[in-house]
């Protein structure tokens, strides 16, 4: 067959840079502390593990394609109508489905400068054009986002809190953003880290979804619930948006194990409280300790911190990453986000956090002595 006749992806597909997950390997013989993917150090709820195991005797059966039990559990937790909830294989799938449903060739999707990489991937996969709004102090800027909106804009994506910076917008600013958008533009509030936020002026956005026809909120079970391996996400949206997404959603996009584990996890309030309390204790400790070493740390409300390094030989983020990796401490390079001189560190176990602080202290001292 002639090479000229081989199948060719449609325009734009090969412009997509595939998402690269955080590293998960250390050198042989070195204890691994994986702090690259914002996973909870407490692991999943024991109730979730038990519920998942109970599904193992009936693997020949298809799962409930509507994830009814999980939607009802989520609705009960947050006081929502289960008919306004869609579950997906992680919030990533839901972000993609929303994009495919509402954005196509010639359309634009707007997101902030250091927003989640999946937005760009989804927009390009749908044949649309990504539009990036500049941030201010590593924080989304409502005025810049509104300025980026054009008649071709179909979706505005806002990660709140944002990954990888850990910054957030107060709810008044989110409302101002929504008020400035045309009614035909969908505002997608990506609240993957909402459970960790301890700020009185923050809200994930449920109120705005309830009172609007063009607002969606997505959430995940991959972070505070510790179920990243099972890929469980959910969104709450206006009925018309739910209908559109369900028309293109795969009929069995969540496994029976995922549905069972998620249903049990969301009911385990004690486990969630313990995970949040661990973060409450360690986030300020890690931030203060790294700052005391002379490193700049972006103030974070999530379960991670963004650490900035000098753009200098021997002191760069790449140098620090190599130094840490050799000691089994795996952080996240964020050059793909336009932050080549930074590393993102998950708030891990006490042992892992202390190991990173000690290792970065050694790294900084070695450079001072060089």
UniProtKB/Swiss-Prot annotation:
EC top class named in words: transferase
GO MF annotation: an example: pyridoxal phosphate binding
The keyword Transferase appears for this protein: yes
Domain of life of the source: Bacteria
SUPFAM superfamilies for this protein: PLP-dependent transferases
Keywords of this entry: Amino-acid biosynthesis, Aminotransferase, Histidine biosynthesis, Pyridoxal phosphate, Transferase
Pathways per UniProt: Amino-acid biosynthesis; L-histidine biosynthesis; L-histidine from 5-phospho-alpha-D-ribose 1-diphosphate: step 7/9
Keyword Transferase: yes
E.C. no: 2.6.1.9
Pfam families hit by this protein: Aminotran_1_2
Cofactors required: pyridoxal 5'-phosphate
Family statement: Belongs to the class-II pyridoxal-phosphate-dependent aminotransferase family. Histidinol-phosphate aminotransferase subfamily.
Alphabetical list of PANTHER family matching this protein: HISTIDINOL-PHOSPHATE AMINOTRANSFERASE, HISTIDINOL-PHOSPHATE AMINOTRANSFERASE 2
Subunit structure: Homodimer.
Protein name from the UniProt record: Histidinol-phosphate aminotransferase
